[in-house]
Amino acid sequence: MSSIYQGQLTVSIFGQSHAPAIGVTVDGIPAGETVDLEELQAFLARRAPGTGAWATTRKEGDKPEFLSGLVQGKTCGAPLAAVIRNTNTRSGDYENLKDIPRPGHADYTAQVKYGGFQDVAGGGHFSGRLTAPLCIAGGVCKQLLARRGIFVGAHIAAIAGIPDASFDPVGLEQAALLAPGEKNLPVIDDEAGKRMQGAIAEAKAQLDSVGGVIECAVLGLPAGLGDPMLDGMENRIARLTFAIPAVKGVEFGAGFGVATLRGSQNNDPFYMDGDRVRTCTNHSGGILGGITNGMPLVFRAAVKPTPSIGQVQDSVSLSRKEDTKLEIKGRHDPCIVPRAVPCVEAAAAIAVYDALLEQEKRREQP
């Protein structure tokens, strides 16, 4: 399975949802960097299951155990390796899934690709549980970025079509960026959050689920970070964001909305702010030609409704080659959007930190 991100950083995610452990290795972090384990644990707690009425009742401590790369709280130059032990699993809920694939899940495609040898319990390696090690890597990168004056934050932009307020794409301040992450439900507008919770509760009562949108921003980036074409900042961030299993779309700046604008509306006019070049608007999301322009980097990720729902659904028996019905057992989130917010932050942090390391390496070359 291809679960490796390769750049100046090499990030490799391993494990399955109901395996003894899940984990990550991160190679390429310079020696001597401080990692605050309490801050990392708090970041992981935002993703952890069992918090909020919208979350699965499966509870996991999600406490990372570092096996390599960290000595007395500082990186030592060896690959950073950490595992999280899986302690609350009920694999019996998944026994029939090799024969009857769940709609909306990777059961069928995994069966075809891996010939029946894949681990189906809890979704195996395809599970959203694997975003926990992604958050270990991203949580470390967030800390390293913050020490450079670069901050990553996100909030729920919408759930079930109910919109939150948006980040200010031009004048976003650090306090406003980070404030949603301090809340149990990471929104800007608390009244919108209450309506979202109502929509989640309604879907849950109907044995259904809802999806939504997450908006993420990065502040403090210098102009000139990234590359054209295949290694642009959009490419890097999108690749890692799509590692989150529920993400089905990513857009930057005005995104698909630019298709309805004229050039005179979409262009972001430049102006001088002292010695600094800025733009009056930010439809580009802080990226032009794959390269940052110094404005806030803003993007959004579309998160699908949880595919595991309690309603009886149509499926097939692969062994009998006939249509059948499926009723999914187990513990599932009626909405995974709130728990996905730190995952999107993690993806952005890895991409940005990796790009910074690459830029620094280039500047060191004669």
Predicted ranges, named:
Residues 1-366:
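Generic N-terminal targeting/processing segments that precede catalytic cores or assembly contacts
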